[in-house]
Amino acid sequence: MSEPIKNIVLVGRTGNGKSSTGNTLLGTKQFKSKNQAKGVTMICEMYRAAIQDGPIINVIDTPGLCDSFVPGDDISNEIINCLTMAEEGIHAVLLVLSARGRISKEEESTVNTLQCIFGSQILDYCIVVFTGGDDLEEDDQTLDDYFRAGCPEFLTKVLRLCGGRKVLFDNKSKDEKKKVEQVKQLLARVENVGEQTGGIPYTYQLHRKIKEENDERLREEERVIESKNRAEAELAEMQQNLLMEKEKLQMEEAKNKQLIAQAEANEKLMEQERAKNRAETELAAVMVEKLQMEEEKNKQLIAQANRMICARDLNIEWSHSEEHWKWVNLDHNISSNTFVEVAELLGVYWFDVSGSLDTTEMAPWTHYEVLFVVNLKDSAFKWNAAVKMNLFYINSRPGGPGTQERAVDMRQHIGKGWVTIHAGEFITTPENVGLIGFRMSEVDSGDNRGGLIVKGVLIRPIN
């Protein structure tokens, strides 16, 4: 019976000790390892070792995933080589980090690049290996002490996604017993990966994903070239059309200048003729007529003008209580550089909103209607009872106009946005002008209702 083979892939940023970790696993120096900024590993390399009382391991070292001096296409090609080397599939991926310093943004980029190349499922096969165990030992620290000093959010997430699998390595140790124990701990994590993934190595999904990404990249390059050629052709055609349009506009402009000059000359002659024929009496009549027209126009404008009473100027029961009502800035008034405040009902049993208006300032002999401007949100609740809408004259003399009252089912307005609800009408005849009041209320049902926004009251002419 042949010994089981485990394919282990090393990934990480240059300088974190990938190659040294590989040599520790193999028990002999096979991978080149130097302490320098530029990566030593430029291509994927694989070496094999038989672990005593354990499996045969194939250790595959890869280029630094975030090395700026290694082109992206080269990294993709080397990943394909890595898969070719791992014939039986990848059994574990060692994400090599250094415990000698703080985790940097480059480490986060390494994890992101790893997921982009292999897919997010690769974290199911990941084991986080921290090198620099000798430094922690000199400082009399453990790996847990290192984490307590501060663990970046992204690393916490990575450890959680890979089942918390982590191990500390001292690649400089000369203690053979310690070396064997390190490798034993790591292989235990590899076995845990197998248990969590059902013993299925990461291979077929990788081949298919990389092939699809390569094909998609080629198709994207073809689309870019095709789009560029099409854009250049469209640009050339557009430039030609613009040139022709420019010539056409220049010709029309010259023609229009001639017509304008002729029209100005004709207008000048006609004006001279009109000035000579006008008489003083006719001019006076024209001025009187103009004044009359302006006066009538101003009356119409006054009659057509709408009046808006904002929510802040209304009497809203319990509006002083933040438990029942909330004041919210809504629209921005550009002319006054202010915000329009609206009142949002959070919940109240006694619902009463009222106000008043002096009609002596309104246009005479005009028919007006009074409308509450409200918004019943989708989440409005407990509006089963009808709401009373009232319009009445305040301090009216005996025999004057009476109170107008109507009931409104507010449920029909839920979710309809801003709506106007009719409260009543009045006509500004000489005998009816004065102070009028209006009210929207419901105080009998005992329901605790909410979800209503009051913007104000609109008074406008009825055509």
Curated annotation (Swiss-Prot):
Q: Name one GO molecular function term.
A: carbohydrate binding
Binding positions (GTP)? 12-20, 33, 171
* Positions of the UniProt region annotated as G2: 39-43
Q: Entry's SUPFAM superfamilies?
A: P-loop containing nucleoside triphosphate hydrolases
Instruction: Using the UniProt annotation, give all residue ranges assigned to the region (G5).
Output: 170-172
Sorted UniProt keywords: Coiled coil, GTP-binding, Nucleotide-binding
* Factors inducing expression: Up-regulated by brassinolides. Down-regulated by 2-aminoethoxyvinylglycine (AVG), high CO(2), isoxaben, and propiconazole treatments.
Under InterPro entries, the record lists: G_AIG1, GIMA/IAN/Toc, P-loop_NTPase, PP2-like
Q: List the Gene3D superfamilies.
A: P-loop containing nucleotide triphosphate hydrolases (3.40.50.300)
Region G1: what ranges?
A: 12-19
Point out the coiled-coil segments of this chain.
173-308
Where do the record's region annotations for G3 lie?
61-64
**What residues does the AIG1-type G domain cover?**
3-211
A Pfam family this protein belongs to? AIG1
Kindly state the tissue distribution recorded for this protein: Expressed in radicles of the germinating seeds.
Looking at the record, which segments are called G4?
A: 131-134
Assigned protein family: Belongs to the TRAFAC class TrmE-Era-EngA-EngB-Septin-like GTPase superfamily. AIG1/Toc34/Toc159-like paraseptin GTPase family. IAN subfamily.
Please identify the protein, giving its name as recorded: Immune-associated nucleotide-binding protein 10
